Amino acid sequence: MSQADLLAQDPVFQLKGSMLAITVMELAHNDLDRLDAQLTEKVAQAPAFFSNTPLVLALDKLPEGEGELNLAELMAVCRRHGLRTLAIRASREGDIAAAEAMDLPVLPPSGARERLLDPAPKKVEEKPAEPEHKPSRIVTSPVRGGQQVYAQGGDLIVLAPVSAGAELLADGNIHVYAPMRGRALAGIKGNTKARIFCQQMGAEMLSIAGHYKVAEDLRRDPLWGDAVHVSLSGDVLNITRL
């Protein structure tokens, strides 16, 4: 076999699954001027968070009566504030057509999958399958800036300090029995019952099921630096003393 044949068989790429933390911006109104002003305030509070942040624009909750959305201008507003649009979530034909014209991926609207999967009435009652139980992932060494630790299908327990710039991800709960200065994202697949437990809250960001608070918000909390328990109530993160 010649060298050219060997090179032809040598793979030049691999497709790998990856769990990425991506911010979803859910628009409630088609008002780009107000959006620009409110984003300016948010960026002033947390400039590091708005630095080349990947974004999904959720347009499926926009009221029908507010007119056609200028998607290109919306993306330009986001770009000016450091938000990089990767895809949109939409149901209106105009929004979908605009995205396709820009070669921008379109995700199904929130709840569409659940509606499609509504089962027909069953003649025979079936016992639901037992959920697969995965053991907690336990980390005993410090998690340093730039590192990412993910507990798939379960809880993440960290027994050492978490530095600024580090990221903890879990499908379930996150426990940090040491100073917590990085990011903690629990329930990343939508588990709204997930919790975060910190022995010393000094985090850059705390998030449960996509609802988050950044350091600028957390520092104003009277429990900053204390042992806390974080839970989700509706769309609001509740922080209480442990």
Swiss-Prot record:
Top-level taxon of origin: Bacteria
Keywords: Cell cycle, Cell division, Septation
Function: Cell division inhibitor that blocks the formation of polar Z ring septums. Rapidly oscillates between the poles of the cell to destabilize FtsZ filaments that have formed before they mature into polar Z rings. Prevents FtsZ polymerization.
Recorded family membership: Belongs to the MinC family.
Keyword set includes Aminoacyl-tRNA synthetase: no
Listed Gene3D superfamilies: 2.160.20.70, 3.30.70.260
Originating gene: minC
Disulfide bonds: none
Transferase as UniProt keyword: no
Protein name listed in UniProt: Probable septum site-determining protein MinC
Composition bias, Basic and acidic residues: 120-135
Region feature Disordered, mapped onto this chain: 120-144
Any one GO BP annotation for this protein: regulation of cell division
A Pfam family annotated for this UniProt entry: MinC_N
Quaternary context: Interacts with MinD and FtsZ.
